[in-house]
Amino acid sequence: THECSSAASDVYKRQIDEVGIILFLLSLFTIFTTSMIYAQLKTVPSWNNMLTPALFIFTALAGGSILLLDYASLVLLLIFGVLQVLFWYIADQSFIHKETSVGTALGFSKNEDIRAFDVAHTNRNYLLNEMVYKVARKHAIKIRYISFFAAFVLPMALILMFPGNFSISVLVIGIHFVGIYFSRWLFFAEAKHSVSFYYN
């Protein structure tokens, strides 16, 4: 009887492990497909690259691994931090290297010197509210520093100082998600849609 119950317990544990792996893979697939909603938008050059899905996936992996409070979470946080910095760099360069200008937005060539005499609308509209959001450069830089410090630097420092200390994990997760909040806000606020050229 004991052997039967032990065998049944082993089978149950294997099934739980298998279900866990399947759910993990489905979660990653969901995150990837969500990220591709943004990555496939050619009208938003800062999103239109393969760093976008990589950033989404490692955001999830790094955040989830914090509960482990071990070196695996440090590695994932480090990869996430590098991807985030690269994403910001590419976002800053995105319109410089794109064949997009006021001319192409209006159907002319990039080299045409096109200037609007007046704004397209007298009042704000949906496109201006959703696609043309301006963030002052000095504020964006400050928010990036806050995001980077809270999402990567502090969590990594606390994990190194208190490895395996589960009570610290709540604090680490809280700090990390503050950084993620600012990072995600910038992801949308700094995105420059091609339609912005039409509105100068």
Region locations from a protein language model:
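C-terminal structured interaction module
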Residues: 168-200
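Long, contiguous internal "core" modules enriched in hydrophobic/ aromatic residues
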Residues: 13-160, 164-180
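Single conserved hydrophobic/aromatic residue that forms the stacking wall/gate
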Residues: 1-12
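Short alpha-helical interface elements
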Residues: 1, 50-57, 195-200
